[in-house]
Amino acid sequence: MLSSTAAHADANTIDASLVGTWTLVAADVLHPDGSRGRDYGADPKGLLVIDERGYYSLQIFKAERPKFASGDKARGTSDEYREAVMGSSTHYGTVSADTVDRILTFHIQNASFPNWQGEEQRRSYEIKGGELSYRVSPRPNGDVPISVWKRLN
């Protein structure tokens, strides 16, 4: 018996131009007033891998995250745990693409933020000059995260 994610991947519609390995160029945020800021610091790091069946793995990290003073993951302070969580975003599952309306749908199997597990998240996207960019749905405060990725292969 196939898991629901595996069954979904078999029927997945993937834009062939998305398949490959992408490195993060920018993780910005568009504020309601039209200004733009850095969501994961000045030099965010990340990797997005999408295979030909639509399976994906995505990681975004703030490069400037401080190390835990104790050196022990189980003994961090409240501030250290907050920085670790807020300085990263990771999830995996399958992704499908509506190539007419230019919408990516991430079918999230697991995520660093547990509330996303089992969710489908839609993002408008474009590919131009070897770069993939997409906009995440607005946050409760109106901010719109924007991710920009550059193809590695």
Question: What positions do the PLM features span?
Answer:
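Lipid interaction determinants
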Residues: 2-153
